[in-house]
Amino acid sequence: MPKNKGKGGKNRKRGKNEADDDKRELVFKEDGQEYAQVTRMLGNGRCEAICVDGTKRLCHIRGKMHKKVWIAAGDIVLVGLRDYQDDKADVILKYMNDEARLLKAYGELPDTVRLNEGVDVDGPEEGEGDSDYIQFEDEDIDKI
């Protein structure tokens, strides 16, 4: 068998984990692009997202982001609209949590978009009846 003369394996090719993108410039949408919130992941590099204009689109994650940038339900993404297919789009960029908060503060995202959708931080809102907490009055306690 020939002797190994290489300079390492796949760990060398992977390189050091340098945090270059921790402070990146905020990218705003251009014409032909739209902000969207991922509703669910479909697999095979696809996801379903609801755009800011109210349209539900099937989004394709581009190859540059595939297996490098992990997208989950509830994430805010920038999608490129297709001029020949209105119900499909391509994911261009995933916004980090702080970038999404900045977009909402700048007024780019409407108030109806809920950030951190998977996490209910402040509990159920007024009017939601799916709570397990029941509050009794003093006279109700005496009857029990």
From Swiss-Prot:
Compositional bias segments (type: Basic and acidic residues): 16-25
PROSITE patterns: IF1A (PS01262), S1_IF1_TYPE (PS50832)
UniProt keyword terms in alphabetical order: Initiation factor, Protein biosynthesis
Residue intervals of the S1-like domain: 22-96
GO cellular component terms, A-Z: cytoplasm
Effect of residue 70 to L: Could be a sequencing error
The keyword S-adenosyl-L-methionine is annotated on this UniProt entry: no
GO molecular function terms attached to this record: RNA binding; translation initiation factor activity
Keyword Transmembrane annotated: no
SUPFAM superfamilies the UniProt entry points to: Nucleic acid-binding proteins
Region (Disordered): 1-25, 120-144
Gene Ontology annotations of biological process type: translational initiation
UniProt biased composition (Basic residues): 1-15
InterPro entries on file: NA-bd_OB-fold, RNA-binding_domain_S1_IF1, TIF_eIF-1A, TIF_eIF-1A_CS
UniProt xrefs under Pfam families: eIF-1a
Spans through the membrane: none
Record family assignment: Belongs to the eIF-1A family.
Task performed by this protein: Seems to be required for maximal rate of protein biosynthesis. Enhances ribosome dissociation into subunits and stabilizes the binding of the initiator Met-tRNA(I) to 40 S ribosomal subunits.
Name of protein: Eukaryotic translation initiation factor 1A
Species for this entry: Triticum aestivum (Wheat)
Source taxonomy: Eukaryota, Viridiplantae, Streptophyta, Embryophyta, Tracheophyta
